[in-house]
Design a protein with these regions (language model features):
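Conserved catalytic core of sirtuin-type NAD+-dependent deacylases
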Residues: 1-238
Length: 238
C-alpha cells in the first residue's frame, strides 16, 4: 500500500465556512496577530486571547467537513494516508481520517501554562480536550494548578510535532499539498524532505512557491474540486 502524505492548510477548511487567517478577508486583517497569537499577548491580555479562541471554537462546532475532507478519509481504503495539518480545527478527524498530526495545535484542547519541560517538550498528560466550550481566562489546571491556555502553537514558539512531520514526509510515495500558501515556516519547507521518486501534487487555485519545482503537478482549483481531480490522477498508483 502506497504511503500518501498530505500537508493541509486553511484552504481545505475554507469551503466548510472556517475563516482563513491570511488572505484578503483573513482573521489577521481584523485582529493584529501580535495582539492575539504570541506568548506576550497571552500574558498581557489573557481575556482577549481566550475570547478570540473561544469564539473560533464555538464557530467550529457549527461547521461540517466538506467533500475534500471526506475524499481524503475515503482514500484510507486504498492508501496509507497520513495528514500533517496546519489547521487547528478537527474537520479531518470528523470526516473519518485516522492519522492526523496537528502542527499548530488544536482548538478543542487547552493545557496548563506550566506543562512545558525542556526534556519532554509539551507534556500531553496535561492537555485537556474541552470540546467546544468556552474557557475563562482565570481557569486553572495541571499539577501546578496554573492558568489554562489554548493548546495552540503561538508565533515565536517552537513546533513540537515538526520532527514527526519531517519523518512522515521522508517516507512518502505521494505527497499532496492542499489549501496552504506555504508562507508559514517551518511548515513551508516540509515538502523539501520528500524522497527521490516521490510524486508531488499541489491543490491551490493560486500560484504556489512549490509549484515551480520541477515535476510537481499543480491542480489550480479549490480544495473540493481539486480533490476529485487528484483522486482520479493517482487512481492507478496503488
Amino acid at each position: 500500500m502506497k504511503r500518501l502524505t498530505v500537508i493541509s492548510g486553511a484552504g481545505i477548511s475554507a469551503e466548510s465556512g472556517m475563516k482563513t487567517f491570511r488572505g484578503s478577508d483573513g482573521l489577521w486583517n481584523d485582529v493584529p496577530l501580535e495582539e492575539i497569537c504570541t506568548p506576550r499577548a497571552l500574558i498581557r491580555n489573557p481575556r482577549r486571547v481566550m475570547e478570540f479562541y473561544n469564539d473560533l471554537r464555538q464557530k467550529l462546532e457549527h461547521v461540517q467537513p466538506n467533500e475534500a475532507h471526506r475524499i481524503l478519509a475515503e482514500m484510507q481504503d486504498s492508501y496509507d494516508v497520513n495528514i500533517i495539518t496546519q489547521n487547528v480545527d478537527n474537520l479531518h478527524e470528523r470526516a473519518g481520517s485516522r492519522n492526523v498530526l496537528h502542527l499548530h495545535g488544536e482548538l478543542t484542547k487547552v493545557r496548563p501554562m506550566d506543562c512545558y519541560t525542556e526534556s519532554d517538550g509539551y507534556s500531553t498528560r496535561y492537555v485537556q480536550d474541552i470540546g467546544y466550550r468556552c474557557v475563562r481566562e482565570d481557569e486553572t489546571g495541571g499539577p501546578g494548578n496554573t492558568r489554562l491556555r489554548p493548546h495552540i502553537v503561538f508565533f515565536e514558539e517552537a513546533v513540537p510535532n515538526l520532527e514527526k512531520a519531517v519523518d512522515t514526509v521522508m517516507q512518502s510515495d505521494i505527497l499532496l499539498i492542499i489549501g496552504t500558501s506555504l508562507q508559514v515556516y517551518p511548515a513551508a519547507m516540509l515538502h523539501t524532505y520528500a524522497p527521490y521518486g516521490c510524486r508531488i501534487y499541489i491543490i491551490d487555485p493560486d500560484e504556489s512557491p512549490a509549484g515551480a519545482i520541477h515535476g510537481v503537478t499543480h491542480i489550480k482549483k479549490v480544495a473540493t474540486e481539486g480533490m476529485r481531480e487528484f483522486k482520479s490522477l493517482i487512481s492507478n498508483i496503488v
